[in-house]
Curated annotation (Swiss-Prot):
Pfam families: DCD. PANTHER family: DCTP DEAMINASE (PTHR42680), DEOXYURIDINE 5'-TRIPHOSPHATE NUCLEOTIDOHYDROLASE (PTHR42680:SF1). It comes from Methanosarcina mazei (strain ATCC BAA-159 / DSM 3647 / Goe1 / Go1 / JCM 11833 / OCM 88) (Methanosarcina frisia). Belongs to the dCTP deaminase family. Archaeal dUTPase subfamily. One of its GO terms (biological process) is dUTP biosynthetic process. This enzyme is involved in nucleotide metabolism: it produces dUMP, the immediate precursor of thymidine nucleotides and it decreases the intracellular concentration of dUTP so that uracil cannot be incorporated into DNA. The keyword Iron-sulfur does not apply. It catalyses: dUTP + H2O = dUMP + diphosphate + H(+). InterPro entries: dCTP_deaminase (IPR011962), dUTPase-like_sf (IPR036157), dUTPase_archaeal (IPR023537), dUTPase_trimeric (IPR033704). Keywords: Hydrolase, Nucleotide metabolism. This is Probable deoxyuridine 5'-triphosphate nucleotidohydrolase. Its EC number is 3.6.1.23. Gene3D superfamilies: 2.70.40.10.
Amino acid sequence: MALLSSNELRKLIKANPPLLENAVDTETQIQPNGLELTLKEIKTIEGAGAVDFDNSERKVPDAKPLEFGKDGWIHLPEGIYKVIFNEIVNIPMNLAAIAKPRSSLIRCGATLETAVWDAGYRGRSESMLVVYNPAGFKLKKNARIMQLLFYTLNTEVEEGYSGVYQNENTN
């Protein structure tokens, strides 16, 4: 298992399907060891969710969109939010990804929570933004907020991700 470099990521972005679609500025978003994802939308989480073993009783709570100001900024009070990214990711069957918040978020008292990005996943993903700073946190639309780190798998998976979130938010 090896972490991909910017050179390898550039090649994969030019592949078919491309590793990353709908980038705001691909060259800016390519980092030495990963790809940065940008903020498309922020929502508040409304109500309780539920998770069980076989997903037969899974319930993802509703979410209410928040509006950016005319200047493109939004001030978020302390709390949790759902964020949706601009980019659509197409992960090949021989890669997986782990996401980390950009260090600037952490230095401002906020962070992102996300799951493993499986081989074969395609979609415009969602993550949880947690604002810990009691004074809140400001974000601008299209801000670079997360970095995806791609790893090669020792062997290609026989069957890639096929869960309910496949192709999410791509319409």
